């Protein structure tokens, strides 16, 4: 629907213990561990099956550039969850969800890492990430959500479908994804590919103009 057709004959989710490799993905099969709730089970299956696209079809190097599979896959996982479980992104936090200040779960994790000076930029080798550092999931997902809002969802989906068609069953690198963007939008995407994916620079918003309209300020 948003990326491209599933080309394999089947998709199978197998239950297994964490010690036996639960939470791992392979083309056409994913291994799922124990989950307490139906929603969280659906979320895990969605994420792991999503890896059939990232990196089972779009076969990026998940060690050198993990955001191309974990980051993009997490973005689409978030879109799925928002579509089928709207306004419930913080359910996994239990009672703590009352104190999140409106942040979604992934945003909250990233904000915590950033405020603690523990955040890392997504486009680096997986060996460089600290233990259980989920920036490559949460920060990357948030950045591609920003790209979706910047381009508009229809344009974003159109570009990602172009990426899929150009690189399915091949080995894309970040420069290949950037090239697809540059060829399919006139908007400047340097902020994504050369700042927020590759450095720890923070967004610096400013007001460019103020416009009065009736009794409102735009």
Where is each model-derived feature located?
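Hydrophobic alpha-helical and helix-loop surface patches within well-folded domains
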Residues: 1-218
